[in-house]
């Protein structure tokens, strides 16, 4: 995002110290230290409080594979490469997404956008959960680069 949008400042968070270490190497290799801050924390817990309601966009690729699918359908090479923490989204694959719905309104500017990659079999349920909140001006499902429905985009009411 920081490479594609040179005018932006990016705060990236992850629970995994290994993910933060890899992101740090990538950020440094791209010479983005002045615009990309990496924080090892759960969701937005480590983001400075004074930044509340200051973000235009919140992007997340949370663990979204339902536990039963992870155990039965995910190829061994994926499970062997990625830590379970990065894949297992709980019983319905929406555990972290539900938490994002709680914290996103605190972080986003009015009219701000939440973009979340999710398991394609649960996008309708995810959209319904967002719509039930009654605070999103629009909730849409978008395709990923392989033309599969995978991204939920919700715009906070202004």
Predicted regions and their residues:
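S-adenosylmethionine
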Residues: 3-156
């Amino acid at each position: 995002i920081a490479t594609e949008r040179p005018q932006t400042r990016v705060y990236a968070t992850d629970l995994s110290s290994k993910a933060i270490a890899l992101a740090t190497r990538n950020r440094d290799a791209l010479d983005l230290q002045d615009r990309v801050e990496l924080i090892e924390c759960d969701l937005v817990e480590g983001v400075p409080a004074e930044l509340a309601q200051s973000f235009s966009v919140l992007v997340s690729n949370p663990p979204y594979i339902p536990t039963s699918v992870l155990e039965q359908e995910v190829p061994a090479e994926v499970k062997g490469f990625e830590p379970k923490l990065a894949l297992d989204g709980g019983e319905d694959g929406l555990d972290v997404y539900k938490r994002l719905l709680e914290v996103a309104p605190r972080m986003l500017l009015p009219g701000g956008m939440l973009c979340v990659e999710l398991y394609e079999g649960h996008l309708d349920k995810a959209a319904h959960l967002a719509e039930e909140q009654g605070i999103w001006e629009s909730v849409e499902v978008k395709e990923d680069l392989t033309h599969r429905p995978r991204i939920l985009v919700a715009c906070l009411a202004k």
